Amino acid sequence: RNYGEYVANGDEVRDIVGKQYQGLRRALRNTTSPDYPSFNMDISDQTRADVWLHEFRNYVEHGSLPSLEIVRLPNDHTSGATHGKPTPRAYMADNDLALGRIVEAVSHSPFWRDTAIVVVEDDAQDGPDHVDSHRSVLLMISAWNRAGVVHRFVNTTDVLATMEEILGLDSLSQFDHYGRPVRGVFAAQPDMTPYDAIKPSVDMNEKNPESPQAKQSAMLDFSRADAADDETLNRILWKTIKGDVPYPGPTRAAVGELIGE
């Protein structure tokens, strides 16, 4: 089931197909939730979570869940410091709570024992700081998780290989074919303890005030994902969140790992 990935916004398709949202790829037409919003920074991720939860409860009631779900929660992109829009902190709190509500629902359901949730960013480059900006977020959530972290280099193709191995799927390309599944996160026995979502301490209704960064943000395109200039937006976010802390500038590092047998 697809929730928001490669989906046209409602205004682009409503008059054509009579549905609010539709997958842009033919393979997604019959598997996309017509009620789940795609990228739109004026829509809360709580709204997206509400739609997902409504469908999930139906799956629980009927005792059947799709083998693979792709769920897009885009509000961690933020709208920079745009006046009147949620602050970056509020957007992130919204994003975190939506994810937490999804994990809570799965972990309290009969599907928890047989479900793994993989959390990644849509892009493997992030704002620059003291760490190479090609790094990205990866969270593996399941009843079979070992506590702690796995200390090894993981690429996006490794994540795909992990999902393919769990689902019993063939590789999509030579890249994920040679990916190394992240088996080290899983334990021999499950821990069925459910998760309860934590309400953010940040006010999710907090709005950006007028500021020099608000004027800069007004010049950026937030209508599409990643349409805003990266460097400009990163500097705006840094100033908004860090204040007078010096901007670190981009860090680039050669990434490699010696793989021994």
Question: Where on the chain are the PLM-derived regions?
Answer:
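N-terminal pro-sequences and low-complexity stem/linker regions of secreted or lumenal proteins
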Residues: 1-261
